[in-house]
Amino acid sequence: MNLLVEHSAARGRARTYARGGACNGTYAPSPAEHTHPPDGGLRYRARVLQPVSVASKTLSDYTHICGRDLIDEIRELAEPLKGSRVAHISATAFGGGVSEILYTLVPLMRDVGLECEWQVIYGREEFFNATKLMHNALQGAPQDLDEEQWETWRRYNEMNARELSGDWDVCLVHDPQPAALHKLVPEKARGWVWRCHIDLSTPNPETIAQLLPYIEDYPQSLFHMADYVPPGMNGKVNVVPPAIDPLTPKNMALSPEDGAYVCGQFGIDVDRPLMCQVSRFDPWKDPLGVIDSYRIVKERVPAMQLALVGSMASDDPEGWDFFNATIAHADGDPDVHILNNFNNVGAIEVNAFQSHADVLIQKSTREGFGLTVSEAIWKARPFIGGNVGGIPLQIEDGVTGYLVDSAEQCAERTLEILADPGLGKSLGRRGKEHVRTHFLTPRYLRDYLKIFNELRES
């Protein structure tokens, strides 16, 4: 794909013109360029903790998908919490699984009677560079932050803490970026929750040692898996996997004709087989390994195509470098389509790629949970995932999909699915029902309400 990008830093927008074929252009905007004023500085206090607008949602709309019993249980749990003031604090409102979850969770909390808000902390590029390094180190990367980067992280947390309004019943802090808020201003909420969305099973020892004093005393903390809980947490620890919203444009039912039409607009030959991975362009997601798997498959199935589809997040400056590395690894192959939101790939387009693909892949080498797994399986398509993190929670190997440990295994399973269409259909059908039971938003809302009730009673 040839990219011609015209970027305006002052206005924070990018226009991308894309034509079919392999992606061979490079582009790397700074997150500060399109999320924060270039001359903002720390003196622009009015821009700290920006509220995020969300559309309204109605819990009853999920009854036909999740069942009456769960909906009734949620309303019963919400009754004593009506009128409670709840704040979600995160690093970004754009890109990544956390923001996608909150665009559904916040309006549903409002629908059941909570006064719920979502606020995004202020940070410039120096902050996001430090927190991206922290994110990788907490998932096992060897490089820790230097003292200047730790000081940058603390300084921005202190600034945001000063501007956080008080009198919250619950303040729910997402991930390490704003994690210091509870230690800095505990008096601004009666109940505090730290929600960790990443894999802390084998963190860099220096990094977790620096972070632990800021997270250890949260009254409640939530992790995707028990293995992710670091030693030393003093409050109550909860294991709560995230979930997807089946009613969003990304996950709603899409006809085969519509899916094929959308894919065709991006240069996909809809009459040829397609492998697809939807994820951030991040080393842990291993898009380079997916390309390697595709090449093995293509030796046996010359018509095979590959789509790598990702959203570039505003708190991920390193992502653009790896996006360009992925393009380089594709080496100009016209059947490798590397796409992101700057190619006008939005929720409907992701839905189309997932619904149309013959095999869906998430070949992560480290993974906090991997919501793209449940999103993919919800489309009832055959799925292959890396045997890491939260992916095995969503996949029963050989029953609802396949778990793999290498590019070669991924290619082997892909070839099995292509050779037996009935196998792919049965994997997809069983996978969809597994997601319906365990990984849809109403279940996630129920788990949060239980925790809020515990905080209220304590």
Describe these PLM feature segments.
Residues 44-85, 103-167, 240-246:
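A conserved catalytic-core segment of Leloir-type glycosyltransferases
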Residues 264-285, 291, 306-307:
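Conserved donor-binding/catalytic core segment of Leloir-type glycosyltransferases
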Residues 310, 314-352:
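Nucleotide-activated donor-binding/catalytic signature segment of Leloir-type glycosyltransferases, i.e.
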Residues 365:
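Aromatic "clamp/platform" in nucleotide-sugar-dependent glycosyltransferases that forms part
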Residues 370-373, 391:
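Short glycine/serine-rich donor-binding loops of glycosyltransferases
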Residues 373, 382-385, 395:
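Short hydrophobic beta-strand element within catalytic cores of glycosyltransferases
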Residues 397-408, 416-421:
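Conserved acidic donor-binding segment of nucleotide-sugar-dependent glycosyltransferases
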Residues 423-438, 444-450:
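A short, well-ordered alpha-helix in the C-terminal region of glycosyltransferases
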